[in-house]
């Protein structure tokens, strides 16, 4: 093997392996659109703990993924998550329409688990908007009626 081959082979292997380290979770694959909005989250938590850099936030319109971002791409600060809208192309069928309400999921990479998530505010989607939200947290089911006998103060 010549000198150049000894250098190029490890570099190619490294580049290919990097693609798999940060591969987007299967359920979070989406197409880009000319119609876009961004939802910025100050924090994202699972059971009250800040998510890891390898965890992902996904945005959905029904069961169609319309955007996603790996938390580590934001370097521990507020994170922008792109949310794509329908732009009259076949690639964006089922994407957000003006006034539609997106839903969110968190992919916990350490557990390989998708979790339903609840944003601190419900903000409808509009093309070109930039929304800032305090928090996104995994959904904790339970009774949210403070006067009920089975009230769960951790439920959302």
Residue ranges and their predicted role:
Residues 2-156:
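Primarily marks secretory-pathway-exposed extracellular/lumenal segments that are disulfide-
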């Amino acid at each position: 093997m010549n000198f150049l081959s000894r250098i190029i082979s490890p570099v190619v292997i490294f580049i290919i392996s990097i693609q798999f380290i940060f591969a987007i979770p299967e359920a979070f694959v989406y197409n880009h659109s000319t119609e876009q909005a961004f939802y910025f989250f100050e924090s994202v938590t699972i059971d009250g703990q800040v998510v890891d850099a390898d965890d992902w936030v996904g945005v959905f319109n029904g069961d169609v993924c319309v955007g996603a971002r790996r938390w580590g791409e934001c370097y521990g600060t507020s994170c922008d998550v792109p949310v794509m809208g329908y732009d009259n192309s076949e690639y964006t069928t089922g994407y957000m329409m003006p006034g539609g309400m997106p839903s969110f999921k968190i992919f916990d990479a350490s557990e390989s688990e998708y979790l339903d998530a609840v944003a601190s505010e419900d903000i409808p989607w509009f093309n070109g908007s930039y929304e800032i939200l305090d928090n996104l947290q995994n959904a904790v089911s339970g009774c949210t009626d403070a006067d009920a006998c089975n009230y769960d103060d951790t439920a959302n």
